[in-house]
Structures are given as C-alpha cells and as structure tokens.
Amino acid sequence: MDNSNKIVFVSGARTPVGRFGGSLAGTENHVMGAHALRAALERGGVPAGAVDEVVIGCVGQVGGDAFLARRIALAAGARPESTAVTVNRLCGSGVEAIRSASLEL
C-alpha cells in the first residue's frame, strides 16, 4: 500500500481550563493553542513540519485571533504552506472541529 496519500488522526490535546482573571489571563490564545498542538503532535510522534492541515475549535475569536488556527499552527512549527481551519460552534466548537476534520478524510 502506498502511504504517501495516507490521512490520519494522530492525537488530540486541549488547552487548560481556567477561570476569569486567573493565572492564564496573561497568556495569548495562540500561545496556549500552540502548546496543545505541540503536545498532540509529540504524543502522536509526528513532526510539526509533516502537518498539512490543522483544525482548531474555538469560541468567540476576535481581532488578532480571527484566524486563530493559522496562528496556532505557525506558532507550533507547521510549514507556511500548510492550511488551517478555525471552527466556531460556541460550546460545541471542539466536537465540531473533530467532526469537520473527519469529514475531510
């Protein structure tokens, strides 16, 4: 079997859950997301440069976070040629991101 076109889910990770004004208040969204993405890639044994697309679920991105998945992917070491998709389905964003990614397979 030719593995050059093989598409797989390798792992998943989520950002920490904090409280309003808590210890994570000064951490930018894309920095936290990049930590989660790097952790998922490390768990799956995949180098960041091998990623073709990143799908991230996030609620309420605005301003500099309008294309949060792209910022996360680049901060985690993905190639500039890779693509990224941010899914905003309010409370269901994470689950919808998984569903959307699976439909692309």
Q: Positions of the model-derived regions?
A:
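Conserved "HGTGT" condensation-loop signature of ketosynthase/thiolase-family condensing enzymes
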Residues: M1-S82
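Active-site-proximal alpha-helical scaffold in enzymes
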Residues: R89-L105
